[in-house]
Amino acid sequence: MTDLKPFLAKVASREPLTRDEARAAFDILMSGQATPSQIGGFLMALRVRGESVDEIVGAVTTMRSKMLTVEAPADAIDIVGTGGDASGTYNISTLAALIVAGAGVPVAKHGNRALSSKSGAADNLSALGVNIDVGPEIISRCIAEASVGFMFAQLHHSAMRHVGPSRVELGTRTIFNLLGPLSNPAGVRRQLLGVFSPQWLVPLAEVMRDLGSECVWVVHGDGLDEITTTGITKVAALEDGKIRSFELSPADFGVSPCVLADIKGGDGVANAAALREVLGGAKNAYRDVSLANAAASLVISGKVETIRDGMKLAAHSLDSGATALALDKLIAVSNDID
């Protein structure tokens, strides 16, 4: 079917789509076969009614089928957030990814330029000197040689160009804010996945279970799409096919609580400078929150069993210079394209 109208009529009447229907509908959207009015109406009908797990699974299945893939080790991990929390924090997941890479776990980092903040992962890494405009072969080399590679979302999801203008005109969150982090081009099966609202914790854990992920922690920390050190982080953890919910506090990581202003960032250049300060030995709230996210990621990866062991390994990665070395290698390999 190449006509969106039947699916549009169904969601407009507040009926949920089946997985197959969602897969077909998003194939129409992402193949350029729907008009801007149809795209806008469809996305907002889903948003107002509330997207179901089956609809997200179907949409992700289509998005994954159209993406440019990257070869990565089977044990690679991603640390990613949905964005959209409007917090303007430092690039926490970026530094956490480098720390995890320095600890010897391969990271296939998926990200984009800023949407609701001043600096997304792509902005931050570009300012650090990483060449983000590279193809799958170079990214695979980065992961092999630096233990971390960056996949710039817009280069891997070209089908998104068909819905981009409508999303901009709508100016509000849609299901596509969720789909990107669920569509890692390296096909990772282990993730630390931050979400902008706690309402999505369990549903997205269910989505990742149904899509075959091995271990995923879906987290929301005190308004942030990250693990936070400002207060309580809520977690829905998918492990061995089962989902359990729990909370984490700064004390669980052995760090002092901070306030949001302590981890507020700026643009890509300012955040790159802040990241370099932490690599240089600065002991501050940015270091603490990044270590916390890295520690959880090391648990998810299977490298360690406990958060406290994760904190020790993450701190060693940072303090030994292994994190800085991972960044240096990433910069070198990503720019070695002759």
Curated annotation (Swiss-Prot):
Transmembrane segments: none
Gene that produces this protein: trpD
Family named by the database record: Belongs to the anthranilate phosphoribosyltransferase family.
GO biological process per UniProt: L-tryptophan biosynthetic process
UniProt name for this protein: Anthranilate phosphoribosyltransferase
Binding site for anthranilate 2: R167
Keywords: Amino-acid biosynthesis, Aromatic amino acid biosynthesis, Glycosyltransferase, Magnesium, Metal-binding, Transferase, Tryptophan biosynthesis
Pathway: Amino-acid biosynthesis; L-tryptophan biosynthesis; L-tryptophan from chorismate: step 2/5
Cofactor entry: Mg(2+)
Pfam short name (any one): Glycos_transf_3
EC class: transferase
Organism: Rhizobium etli (strain ATCC 51251 / DSM 11541 / JCM 21823 / NBRC 15573 / CFN 42)
Gene3D superfamilies: Nucleoside phosphorylase/phosphoribosyltransferase catalytic domain, Transferase, Pyrimidine Nucleoside Phosphorylase, Chain C
Any GO molecular function: magnesium ion binding
Oligomer and partners: Homodimer.
Biological role stated in the UniProt entry: Catalyzes the transfer of the phosphoribosyl group of 5-phosphorylribose-1-pyrophosphate (PRPP) to anthranilate to yield N-(5'-phosphoribosyl)-anthranilate (PRA).
Entry EC no(s): 2.4.2.18
Residue sites binding Mg(2+) 2 per the record: D225, E226
